[in-house]
Each structure stands twice: as structure tokens, then as C-alpha cells.
Amino acid sequence: MKLAYWMYAGPAHIGTLRVASSFKNVHAIMHAPLGDDYFNVMRSMLERERDFTPVTASIVDRHVLARGSQEKVIDNITRKDKEQRPDLIVLTPTCTSSILQEDLQNFVARASISSDSDVILADVNHYRVNELQAADRTLEQIVRYFLNKARRQGVLTRSLTDTPSANIIGIFTLGFHNQHDCRELKRLLQDLGIKVNQVIPEGGSVEHLQDLPKAWFNIVPYREVGLMTAKYLEREFGMPYLSTTPMGIVDTAEFIRQMEKYVNSFLSKEKVNYESYINYQTQFVSQAAWFSRSIDCQNLTGKKVVVFGDATHAASITKILVREMGIHVGCAGTYCKHDAEWFNEQVQGFCDEALITEDHTEVADTIARIEPSAIFGTQMERHIGKRLEIPCGVISSPVHIQNFPLGYRPFLGYEGTNQIADSVYNSFTLGMEDHLLDIFGGHDTKEVITKSLSTETDLTWNPESQRELNKIPGFVRGKIKRNTEKFARQEGITTITVDVMYAAKEALST
């Protein structure tokens, strides 16, 4: 446990609650002190949904500490069972309430006796795993529980659907553009004549989990959540799964070819061939292939960027920038330390260096050192970019409300390639616009203000040097200011004059 100004992945119980609240008619009870119960507020604010968040906090207060939690937890479970009539109640502690070392499994067993709903305790080590790992584990636990239940009742069958079908595993609440990605995946599968058997956990019913084995194969669009479930289904039922993320033209084509291979492995007579579909989509539907050859995109060739996010999005965006747009990735990084080996394999040869860290200050220092033309990252990298006056495109969770758009903005599939191309192009400062505004003023009559880029206050710019700095085009002003301040510190100068500016320029060019 640690005190942090910013966390890329939250505590484990958030992952469990995200999965539980994604299913239909599943209620979660969080055994937690006040302060840990912010999930309801966070989800209600960010997700554009009309329904209430199905999570109840069983508060650990002084009475609980004096008498124990058993009575309160069991009362909350039985009350919610009678009020909500859920198919499943998931009990989860938080890392704080886990300190009490209570036998919550016993509470669940006691509550199950008088409840009509199924009741389970989230099987997660709250000290060892983060939000994403806990979500992956909880989803697998729920799927395993209901498939075992169906097997005991004798209603579990492996009879495949008549036509090609797939399960989409890992779409869930508070995910980065997950709802849009799901729609795009469904459209892609429909175009190829593949039926969607089930989508879990988002909008799925635990009562229908027994039908998961009827699909021909599983699709795991994001490595962070769903991989454990897919591996479990492969072990138990021999179901193949695709973990290639269909992001960008190259990987989307590879994803479709893998589906073709899986579908043909089940067909005995008429085999399918999706190559004509790939060619048509690449040439006429996706604008990204055409855009990458346009003069606008060629202006970005060789520009240096930094990419940081979850393993899936950071790796995919890195490959898209290099392979499809000719952009130079100075550093690609992820906060998914548990998936570092896979990430390093994916970005090898596509970037100058890889960064695996959960420390936002390390990311900020790397960005300041590389001085990229643009950043592609999370909400935190956007804050860093604003401070350093470097534009940032948001490509991964964690994000704030502006990245839960009402409009249709997928990142997967062929429509996703258009969205990514737009996001990349619009993230770069196109120089000339700022330059013309600096020269002619535009409609903005304010004096140009140069933001301070450093947190240190040991340097001052006199009025003449400030005016000289304001004459420099905006798209390079920040870099010149940083270089001048760096030179001044090296030389022990505290007041920056015009002469110091020119001396810094001369020192840099020699």
C-alpha cells in the first residue's frame, strides 16, 4: 500500500466492481471504510448510463471494529437479495478492510443459506494485484462458477452453433472507448457472416454464461481483461481464442486472417476467404491507408513522439505510428508491469527505448528529456504535456470524462483506423497556424503570454528578453526557453537577458 498523487491502475477492488457492475442483474457489496467507496460516484460521473451503479458499501465503522463485521455484512447481503433479486451477489473487501483479516468466505457461506441469489467472495489478493489484474481474475472466477454450476445441474453442453460464432470477452464498464469498440467489432463480424454468441461482461447475463461453449472461438480484444477467461475456456472446452487486437490496418487484417483460419478449421466443405473483404475495406472504407500517403501525413514523417498507456493500446499505437504513418517513436511505455515481457516483445524494433513503470514522475522526466513533438498517452500524460507545452493525444485509460464521448469513436476495426489517424494528426502542433497568429495577431488582441515550463524559481527573465522570446514562433518557443534556462543554470546566471539568449543559441549550435 502506498500514498500516491496519481495511480495509473487503481486498487484491486475497483477492478472487481467494474466487472460485477458490467453484468446485468449482478450486485456487488463492498466491505470498506468511508473513503474507499468512491466507485459509485466515479462510475456515475464517467459512464453515460441511465441506470444506477449496482454497488452497495457495507461501511466498516467504529461499531464494526468493536463487534466484528459478520452481522452487518450478512444483513446487507440478505437485504439486497430481497430488494434487488439479483442473479449474483459479489462480496469484495478493499485493501484497507483486508487488514482486519476477517473470514469473509464464512460470511458468504452463512448468507447463501438464506439467499435466493448466488453469493460469491471475490477471490483476489488485494495486496498483490492491481485493478486490471483483479478484473481479469474476477471475470474468470464468475465464468468458472456458473459453468461449474451448469455442469452440476446437467445443462452444460458443447454443441456448437450451426453458423460461425464468437464470444467477445473483456468489454466492460469504464474501459477506454469500449462501447464503441464493441459496436465496431460486432459490425466487422456481421460483415464476415460470424454471429456474436455473447459479449461479457458488459451487458451480459450470468444465467447465459452456460452458453459460452457454444461459440466456435473467443475474441479477447484487450490483453488486460479477458485473457484468463479465454485460457480457462480453452483448457476446459478446447475453445481457440484470438488475442490479436484489431487496431490499425495491419493488425486488423491479421485479426481477420486468424478468424478465417479458425472458421475454416470447423468447416468441412465450403471454406471461407476473407481476403477480398480485407482489400475492399483497406482501399475504400478505411481512409487511413490513403491518408498515410497524403502530403499532410508526410509532413509528420520523422517527427519524434512518446507513447505511454496500458499494454494493449500503447503497443498497438506504437506499431501504427511507425508502420503506417512513418512517425519516429522515441519511447514506448506501459504501466502494466505484470505484462512487461509481452510489451517488450511487441515494441522491439519500433522504438528507441521501452519504459515499464507505474511512476508518473519517471514518465514526465522521460518526456522532458526526449522533447518529442507530440505525446500519446493517458490523462496524466496530457497534464504533463500541458506543463511542457507539448501536444498530447489520449489513447489509453485512465482518462477523464472528455474521453467518454457521446459520438461514435471506436479504436478497433476499420472505422477505428480513421479515428486513430484523426487523433494522431490533430495532436501535432502544425506550426504555421501558430506562426501566422503570432505575426498577424488574428482576432486575439491579448499579449502573448509564455507559460513557465520549469517549477524552479531561481531564474528571472528581464523585460527585454521576455519581449524577444515572445517574437519567436509559438511552436518552438517552449524548446528555446528550456534550452536558454538550461544554459543559464550551467553558467550560474540568475537573470536572463537578450545577450544570454544569444549566448545559449551559440553554445547549442557549436
From Swiss-Prot:
Gene Ontology cellular component terms for the protein in this record: chloroplast
Molecular functions per Gene Ontology:
4 iron, 4 sulfur cluster binding; ATP binding; metal ion binding; oxidoreductase activity, acting on iron-sulfur proteins as donors; oxidoreductase activity, acting on the CH-CH group of donors, iron-sulfur protein as acceptor
Q: Which UniProt keywords apply?
A: 4Fe-4S, ATP-binding, Chlorophyll biosynthesis, Chloroplast, Iron, Iron-sulfur, Metal-binding, Nucleotide-binding, Oxidoreductase, Photosynthesis, Plastid
User: What main location does UniProt list?
Assistant: plastid
Q: Report the domain of life of the source organism.
A: Eukaryota
Localization, per the record, is:
Plastid, Chloroplast
Give the catalysed reaction(s), semicolon-separated: chlorophyllide a + oxidized 2[4Fe-4S]-[ferredoxin] + 2 ADP + 2 phosphate = protochlorophyllide a + reduced 2[4Fe-4S]-[ferredoxin] + 2 ATP + 2 H2O
Q: Which residues bind [4Fe-4S] cluster?
A: 36
Question: Which residues of the sequence carry a binding annotation for substrate?
Answer: 431-432
- Entry-linked InterPro entries: ChlB/BchB/BchZ (IPR050152), LI-POR_suB-like_C (IPR013580), Nase/OxRdtase_comp1 (IPR000510), P-CP_red_C (IPR042298), Protochl_reductB (IPR005969), Protochlorophyllide_Rdtase (IPR016209)
> Which prosthetic group or cofactor does it need?
[4Fe-4S] cluster
Tell me a GO biological process for this protein. Answer: light-independent chlorophyll biosynthetic process
Question: Which stretches are annotated as coiled coil?
Answer: none
Pathway-wise, it operates in:
Porphyrin-containing compound metabolism; chlorophyll biosynthesis (light-independent)
One Pfam family assigned to this protein is Oxidored_nitro
Q: What is its EC number?
A: 1.3.7.7
Q: Which Gene3D superfamilies match?
A: 1.20.89.20, Nitrogenase molybdenum iron protein domain, Proto-chlorophyllide reductase 57 kD subunit B
Oligomeric state and partners?
A: Protochlorophyllide reductase is composed of three subunits; ChlL, ChlN and ChlB. Forms a heterotetramer of two ChlB and two ChlN subunits.
Family (UniProt): Belongs to the ChlB/BchB/BchZ family.
Give the matching HAMAP family: ChlB_BchB
What role is this protein assigned?
A: Component of the dark-operative protochlorophyllide reductase (DPOR) that uses Mg-ATP and reduced ferredoxin to reduce ring D of protochlorophyllide (Pchlide) to form chlorophyllide a (Chlide). This reaction is light-independent. The NB-protein (ChlN-ChlB) is the catalytic component of the complex.
- This protein is called Light-independent protochlorophyllide reductase subunit B
- Which organism encodes this protein? Angiopteris evecta
> Which taxonomic lineage does the organism of this UniProt entry have?
Eukaryota, Viridiplantae, Streptophyta, Embryophyta, Tracheophyta
Q: Which gene encodes it?
A: chlB
